[in-house]
């Protein structure tokens, strides 16, 4: 009788409770049962393969058939006194056997430092620890290639890895929890390089759910929901851009941003196709930046993308993560900055995503009065929990580092800052000081901004914050939130209300166009004419303009010139640059045919190109956006004529006079005060024939004399076309 035969039955079966937990999928330490274990003068190898017909342990050239104990557990006792290198040959009914290294013989792939930093919320490169990562280990029998998986689910009864590799069986790949960290981990040899997977989580609530990886770098194309192992081999070509970016401060640079929803800009294009077509379009029309509506994976293609289900994965609808890198790279090499919308305020309740991840409120706040956003039917992140805060801060760094993103536009900041945001009187709980401010969210935003700006000098963070919260763009070192800029929602609402009115009524609402200057320098502002203004029955900018098509076109041109002249950076949603007439549709995309059918659309598009070019070439329009020294009124009070006029001042001493006639009629012989006498060149006239206007103007310029007017030492007499803007500079 061989020594192996003598050992048959020795220690083969684990403790009954261990086997029961394995079968139930709720064992916290399957590695303590499975794999190779020393028992005095012999070793027992156990493998859990519930659907296998036969399992053989291979040691060197020797083969040892394993005994089926019960419920898919196989075991064999071997006469060795030291842990050995071995493989498993596994056979299933009606299939060829295959040989693989045993997943349960490998040490944890996360170290104590990773787990400690995560528990404290300070792991800035958390995506390198959690999620799915291809790895290789050198053994006596050669190199073992595979993928390590790690997921945070501290309250789960058990977690298993499922995927194509095991026929989506929840029993063959149980994971182990690493100490008290709540992180479950498993290295699986020979896992496919781009394999699909999920985690089967036995929740604390008794519910078994199949979950996408919160740290997945890639996903299936929706509506499928599996995560995909993803490795980047992209070679960047934007080194010059990245070097120069680190030396710049966007607050003091020109920023004219084209806001894009990738799926509907030109439907059907991939990231690689967009890298050519979108880049060429943006360059041709002289924008400095693009802002992409949320690129992170989201379940509903017909949405803007603000309900994110995979925060670390660019949507797979348009290609792979490396394809998205190619888009960013192409834009950078063309001199275009890339901002992405980022959504840390809330997340959807899809049962396969983050919500109730381990059967308890994990990523979301446990108090329903803080953990749910009623308006949107979503969960709200628990900003006070270190691991959740770490998940989000690391995510911001991930997009900036891994995709060379130049900025994050943070969505729905107001909903984060106020505990009573859009809640009934009895639907919220106060903070520790009995106030309505969400102190944990404030701390999170400060940490995110400080960390991002330290890690990547030259990037921009922009808040969509619709209230008067003080210090949104103040540095965190003096108590601010630390954003670079915030959207000026007040300017947007007042301006659109004004220009939507018939000109004969505008004089009664003149204050709507002057009020913004009372607070224009209280924060660093972006002036948004965004996607929010072209949905839900709001129509389009074109549709808001009163009158005939000729009048609408003139009104839109003057509005855009006013936006570009006003202190603040510019943002314009796609389609508005050529006066799209129909409201946005994710199915139809933009109405590019308008450029073939009417001169008004071409005129507006030509104007946008020209004002972008003029804007970038004249620092008076951008270098002092955030300081009163960059702006002075000529006349803020000519409501009778519906005229506004002001000067923009550059940090180099340059000046631009900006005059707006929002009346529906021409003003001839209009005297305007100017800072110096002499020739003033007409830099822009929105009524010019090249913009399909009527051609009324000043023949390219005016001569200012030393006649004081409007409190200025000089003045000139101008012709102001109806619904127009004029920009003048000293010749």
Curated annotation (Swiss-Prot):
GO terms for molecular function: 1,4-alpha-glucan branching enzyme activity; cation binding; hydrolase activity, hydrolyzing O-glycosyl compounds. GO terms for cellular component: cytosol. The keyword DNA damage does not apply. Its EC number is 2.4.1.18. Keywords: Carbohydrate metabolism, Glycogen biosynthesis, Glycogen metabolism, Glycosyltransferase, Transferase. GO terms for biological process: glycogen biosynthetic process. It catalyses: Transfers a segment of a (1->4)-alpha-D-glucan chain to a primary hydroxy group in a similar glucan chain. The active site is at 411 (nucleophile), 464 (proton donor). Monomer. Catalyzes the formation of the alpha-1,6-glucosidic linkages in glycogen by scission of a 1,4-alpha-linked oligosaccharide from growing alpha-1,4-glucan chains and the subsequent attachment of the oligosaccharide to the alpha-1,6 position. NCBIfam families: branching_enzym, PRK05402.1, PRK12313.1. HAMAP family: GlgB. This is 1,4-alpha-glucan branching enzyme GlgB.
């Amino acid at each position: 009788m061989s020594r192996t035969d003598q050992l048959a039955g020795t220690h083969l079966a684990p403790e009954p409770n261990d086997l029961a937990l394995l079968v139930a999928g709720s064992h916290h330490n399957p590695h303590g049962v499975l794999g190779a274990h020393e028992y005095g003068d012999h070793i027992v190898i156990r493998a859990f393969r519930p659907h296998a017909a036969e399992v053989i342990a291979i040691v060197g050239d020797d083969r040892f058939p394993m005994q089926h104990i019960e419920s898919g557990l196989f075991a064999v006792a071997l006469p060795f006194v030291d842990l050995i290198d071995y493989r498993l040959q596994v056979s299933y009914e009606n299939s060829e056997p295959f040989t693989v290294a045993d997943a349960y013989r490998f040490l944890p792939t996360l170290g104590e430092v990773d787990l400690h930093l995560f528990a404290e919320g300070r792991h800035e490169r958390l995506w390198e620890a959690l999620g799915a990562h291809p790895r290789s280990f050198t053994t006596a029998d050669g190199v073992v290639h595979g993928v390590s998986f790690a997921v945070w689910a501290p309250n789960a009864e058990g977690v298993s890895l499922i995927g194509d590799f095991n026929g989506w069986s929840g029993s063959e790949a149980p994971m182990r929890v690493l100490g008290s960290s709540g992180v479950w981990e498993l290295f699986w040899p020979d896992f496919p390089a781009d394999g699909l997977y999920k985690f089967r989580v036995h929740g604390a609530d008794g519910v078994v759910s199949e979950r996408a990886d919160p740290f997945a770098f890639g996903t299936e194309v929706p509506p499928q929901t599996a995560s995909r192992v993803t490795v980047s081999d992209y070679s960047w070509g934007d080194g010059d851009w990245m070097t120069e970016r680190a030396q710049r401060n966007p607050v003091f640079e020109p920023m004219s941003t084209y806001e894009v929803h990738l799926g509907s800009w030109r439907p059907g294009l991939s990231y690689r196709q967009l890298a050519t077509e979108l880049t060429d379009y943006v360059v041709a029309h002289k924008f400095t930046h693009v802002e992409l509506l949320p690129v992170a994976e989201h379940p509903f293609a017909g949405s803007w993308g603000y309900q994110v289900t995979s925060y670390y994965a660019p949507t797979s609808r348009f290609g792979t993560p490396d394809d998205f890198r190619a888009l960013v790279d192409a834009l950078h090499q063309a001199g275009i900055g890339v901002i992405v919308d980022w959504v840390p305020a809330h997340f959807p309740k899809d049962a396969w995503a983050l919500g109730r991840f381990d059967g308890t409120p994990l990523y979301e706040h446990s108090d329903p009065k803080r953990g749910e956003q009623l308006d949107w039917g979503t969960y709200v992140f628990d900003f006070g929990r270190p691991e959740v805060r770490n998940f989000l801060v690391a995510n911001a760094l991930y997009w900036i580092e891994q995709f060379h993103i130049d900025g994050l536009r943070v969505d729905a900041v107001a909903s984060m800052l106020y505990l009573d945001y859009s809640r009934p009187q009895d639907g919220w709980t106060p903070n520790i000081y009995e106030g309505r401010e969400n102190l944990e969210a404030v701390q999170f935003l400060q940490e995110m901004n400080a960390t991002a700006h330290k890690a990547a000098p030259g990037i921009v963070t922009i808040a969509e914050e619709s209230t008067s919260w003080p210090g949104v763009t103040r540095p965190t070192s003096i108590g601010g939130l630390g954003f670079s800029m915030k959207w000026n929602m007040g300017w947007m609402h007042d301006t659109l209300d004004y220009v939507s009115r018939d000109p004969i009524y505008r004089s009664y609402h003149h204050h709507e166009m002057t009020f913004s200057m009372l607070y224009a320098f209280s924060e660093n502002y972006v002036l948004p004419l965004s996607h929010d203004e072209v949905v839900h029955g709001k129509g389009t900018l074109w549709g808001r303009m009163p009158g005939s098509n000729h009048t609408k076109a003139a009104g839109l041109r003057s509005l855009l010139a006013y936006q570009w002249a006003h202190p603040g950076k510019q943002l314009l949603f796609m389609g508005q640059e050529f006066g799209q007439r129909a409201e946005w549709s994710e199915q139809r995309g933009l109405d590019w045919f308008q450029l073939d059918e009417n001169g008004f659309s071409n005129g507006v598009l030509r104007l946008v190109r020209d004002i972008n070019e003029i804007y970038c070439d004249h620092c008076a329009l951008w270098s002092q956006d955030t300081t009163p020294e960059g702006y002075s009124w000529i006349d803020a009070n000519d409501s009778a004529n519906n005229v506004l006029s002001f000067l923009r001042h550059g940090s180099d001493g340059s000046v631009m006079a900006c005059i707006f006639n929002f009346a529906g009629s021409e003003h001839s012989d209009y005297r305007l005060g100017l800072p110096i006498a002499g020739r003033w060149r007409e830099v822009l006239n929105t009524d010019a024939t090249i913009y399909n206007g009527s051609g009324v103007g000043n023949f390219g310029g005016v001569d200012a004399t030393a006649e004081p007017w409007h409190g200025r030492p000089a003045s000139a007499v101008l012709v102001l076309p109806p619904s127009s803007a004029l920009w003048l500079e000293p010749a």
